[in-house]
Amino acid sequence: MATDDFFSLQREYWRQVAESDGFDIESVQIPPSMYGRINGLIPHNCEINTPLPYRVLGKHYAKLGLHRYNMLKGTKFEFGRLMKFNMLQNCVASFYITLEAYDYGVPGTSHPQTFQVRIDEKIFGSLDLTVSIARRTTDEVTTKKPFIHHYHGGAVADNIIFKGELPDWPSDDVLKDRERFYVIMNESEWRATAWISLYLELVLCAHDKFITNTDLSRLSIEKVAIETSIGDALLYERLEAKSANVYIWFKRLEKPRVPQQVFVTGMDVERKAIIRRVMDSTGYLTLVGKLCGGVTKVRQFN
């Protein structure tokens, strides 16, 4: 096949994908001779009860999309089930996810609603992603942006505290600054805020995309600190802040798997994670995070 013909078919493939913003590609047609040659999306049907790669990651990305929707709309949708997702064939991937969720914040509402969520990863092996779409399939799409199959941008912070590299872990003295930090010691407080556990699990999923639900279910959060730039604010205001650094102390992770890093092993080892959340006026939600305390591997050359 001539090079021009190949690129023409590649463009036609993405034109068809763009018609549904990447979510419904069952009707996308390509010539049989191009199977396995088109650099496109890999569909995953979660309705079929078979082993599925990235199922845990896809479920967490779906929950993050709902979290973004709830922050924007003031709703209380909760994850129901993962229906399907389409995934870009890259180490740094984009996910186009379809899921069902329930609005438990509205009395008498028991029927599921279908959502679409788009996640674009930015770095391999580390949490750095952006949620650019989180919507119900019944929502009216008022602005149709040009379709780009992998988005490299992110939400823009409005305060220097939340720009650039993630901060180092704060000292005990720094954490005493109540203008910047709110430390949550009470387990009932952070358990009532489901996104704190979600953020931690996303950090671990980003480092190890094949981590299991069993691994995640063992985690025990010990303490949480929320850093914001809104001064003397109430807890709920800090929890709902569009920009925040979240510091989490936790245990019950036997052996962290982080590219090019080595950690002390043991279920009772106290570990630390930092996650930054930024949501801007576009509605984009960007999360960046890392697991602290690792030692960089030294490469040896013979």
UniProtKB/Swiss-Prot annotation:
Q: InterPro entries this protein is in? A: MS5 (IPR006462)
What UniProt keywords apply to this chain's record, in alphabetical order? Acetylation
Tell me the Pfam families matching this sequence. Answer: protein_MS5
Record PTM N-acetylalanine, positions in chain: A2
Superkingdom field: Eukaryota
Q: Which family does it belong to?
A: Belongs to the UPF0725 (EMB2204) family.
Show the PANTHER family listed in the entry. Answer: (RAPE) HYPOTHETICAL PROTEIN (PTHR31260:SF77), CYSTATIN/MONELLIN SUPERFAMILY PROTEIN (PTHR31260)
Cite the NCBIfam families for this sequence. A_thl_para_3677
Q: What is this protein called?
A: UPF0725 protein At1g23960
**What organism does the record attribute this protein to?**
Arabidopsis thaliana (Mouse-ear cress)
